[in-house]
């Protein structure tokens, strides 16, 4: 009997903590899936070459501490969490921080170099979307044991689920994979990715998720690494890559509408980051930037992950005027602007 009383008190305490943790926030939880745009450190302890838990990554983050974020500071989803009223960030699910009541504000399952296409993650030792979904199921079981089935159902249905993927599928797979190039046009490959996307949303829906936001592809042809690898010596944005991004994003928006019509109660928003990001690149001074082609880290042409390190020659002293932190990822300053766009476009996920 005494054991039952202690157990019952612990459940009551955790339920109270659940409501306390989300009291200042407008939604009970934030749950993230996808790639390096939203990864906050899940790759840190993997046998993967794609990591960022070392300086100069994180040099402008809290306590100048590298966490595994592919940025000099905060990601767009970090700013989004702040805007939504969270006092801390949902932890990386594979980190030590993802313990006890910390996961009651959500969790982050994203893994750098993953994509809609599971094979994209294999060469890099990253966590595929399929595996991220299995971790999410384990997360749901843990939360349900902690706060009870009814409260857990509220958390999953009212919490916002964010998905960011697709860039790695194109830049780190399709464009450099001769077999995929031979078998599929960019349009056909986009259809393959969107079938995986639809299946992923279907699975989330069956697991109780009702508020989901998916981040579009950025102007891929304007990433410094893309210009270096695919620009044929030209220093301008690679037009064909940007055209592929536009094509994919159009299909993504159409697919989200079809999925919403098919699933009762589903709120699904396709966040358009392409145009806001392109506006920053094409009108830098209007947004407080002066460098759009060269990234801050190293030579600014290709460095990312282990190539962007404390010994990288040429790393800028102050990244606030740079659009790109490394060859693939924006600076904290850009992430803050993009987070405002996400918030504005995602009102339907909040109300």
UniProtKB/Swiss-Prot annotation:
It is an enzyme of class 3 (hydrolase). GO terms for cellular component: extracellular region. It comes from Arabidopsis thaliana (Mouse-ear cress). It comes from the Eukaryota. It is found in: Secreted. The active site is at residues 36, 326, 329. GO terms for molecular function: hydrolase activity, acting on ester bonds. This is GDSL esterase/lipase At3g53100.
């Amino acid at each position: 009997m005494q054991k039952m009383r202690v157990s019952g008190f612990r459940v009551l305490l955790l339920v109270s903590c659940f409501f306390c943790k989300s009291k200042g926030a407008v939604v009970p939880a934030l749950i993230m899936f996808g790639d390096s745009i939203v990864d906050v450190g899940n790759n840190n302890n993997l046998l993967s070459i794609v990591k960022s838990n070392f300086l100069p990554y994180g040099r402008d983050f809290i306590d100048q501490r590298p966490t595994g974020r592919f940025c000099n500071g905060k990601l767009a989803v970090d700013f989004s969490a702040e805007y939504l009223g969270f006092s801390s960030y949902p932890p990386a699910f594979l980190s030590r921080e993802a313990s006890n009541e910390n996961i009651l504000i959500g969790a982050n399952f994203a893994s750098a170099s993953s994509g809609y296409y599971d094979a994209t993650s294999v060469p890099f030792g990253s966590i595929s979307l399929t595996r991220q979904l299995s971790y999410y199921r384990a997360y749901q079981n843990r939360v349900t044991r902690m706060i009870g089935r009814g409260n857990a159902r509220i958390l999953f249905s009212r919490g916002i689920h964010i998905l960011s993927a697709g860039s790695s599928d194109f830049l780190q797979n399709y464009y450099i994979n001769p077999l995929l190039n031979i078998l599929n046009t960019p349009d056909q490959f986009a259809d393959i990715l969107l079938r995986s996307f639809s299946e992923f949303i279907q699975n989330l829906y069956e697991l109780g998720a009702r508020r989901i936001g998916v981040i579009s592809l950025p102007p891929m042809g304007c990433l410094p690494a893309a210009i270096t690898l695919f620009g044929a010596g030209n220093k301008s944005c690679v037009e064909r890559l940007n055209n592929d991004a536009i094509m994919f994003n159009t299909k993504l928006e159409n697919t989200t509408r079809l999925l919403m019509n098919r699933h009762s109660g589903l709120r699904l928003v396709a966040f358009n980051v392409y145009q806001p990001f392109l506006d920053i690149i094409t009108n830098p001074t209007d947004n407080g930037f002066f460098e759009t082609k060269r990234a801050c880290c190293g030579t600014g042409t290709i460095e990312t992950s282990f190539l962007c390190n404390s010994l990288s020659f040429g790393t800028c002293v102050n990244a606030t005027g740079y659009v790109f932190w490394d060859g693939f990822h924006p600076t904290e300053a850009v992430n803050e602007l993009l987070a405002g766009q996400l918030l504005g476009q995602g009102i339907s996920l909040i109300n």
